[in-house]
A protein has these predicted regions:
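Extended charged
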Residues: 1-4, 12, 21-25, 42-67, ...
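Short cysteine-rich clusters marking metal-coordination/redox-active sites
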Residues: 17-20, 70
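Histidine-centered catalytic micro-motifs used for acid/base chemistry in nuclease
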Residues: 29-35, 68
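Short regulatory "switch" loops immediately downstream of catalytic or recognition motifs
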Residues: 33-44
Length: 131
C-alpha cells in the first residue's frame, strides 16, 4: 500500500478508529469494510489449511472499501460484515456478565454502569472537521 493511501485512510475519521472511535496509535490497521477473504488451500505436507496468496474478492481491495481501525476492532471484526460485527459487539455485555467474575464484582461495587443501547460505529456518527 502506498504511503499516501495509508495516510488518506488514517485521516478519514480524524485519526480515529472507524468502529470504536479511539485515537489510532502506531500499529493501527487498515480494515476492508466488505471482507476481501483470503483463499486457503489444504497443504498435505503440513496437514493443515494455509493461505495461498490470493483472495476471493480482489475488487474489494480499494480505498472506498477501507477504513482505519484500531488493532482490537480489526482483529475482532476479522472477515465479518458490518452487521455481524455489530451483533458480536452487542453480545459482549452478555458474555461479560456470564463469564467474567471481575466484571460482575466491579458492577456490584458500582464501578461499571451498563448502558444497553444499539451499537453505533464511530463512522456512522462522524461529522468531519468543521461541522
Amino acid at each position: 500500500m502506498k504511503k499516501a493511501d495509508r495516510e488518506f485512510i488514517f485521516n478519514k475519521y480524524g485519526g480515529r478508529c472507524a468502529y470504536c472511535g479511539c485515537e489510532l496509535v502506531k500499529g493501527w490497521h487498515v480494515d476492508e469494510i466488505k471482507p476481501v477473504r483470503r483463499k486457503q488451500v489444504y497443504d498435505k505436507i503440513k496437514g493443515k489449511w494455509v493461505y495461498d496468496g490470493t483472495c476471493r474478492h480482489p475488487q474489494r481491495f480499494c480505498l472506498d472499501n477501507q477504513n482505519p481501525a484500531c488493532a482490537s476492532c480489526n482483529i475482532n471484526k476479522h472477515a465479518m460484515s458490518l452487521e455481524k460485527f455489530r451483533q458480536l459487539v452487542s453480545g459482549f455485555m452478555v458474555s461479560l456478565n456470564r463469564d467474567s467474575t471481575q466484571y460482575k464484582v466491579a458492577k456490584r461495587y458500582g464501578l461499571i454502569k451498563e448502558d444497553i443501547r444499539p451499537v453505533r460505529f464511530y463512522f456512522e456518527t462522524f461529522k468531519g472537521e468543521g461541522t
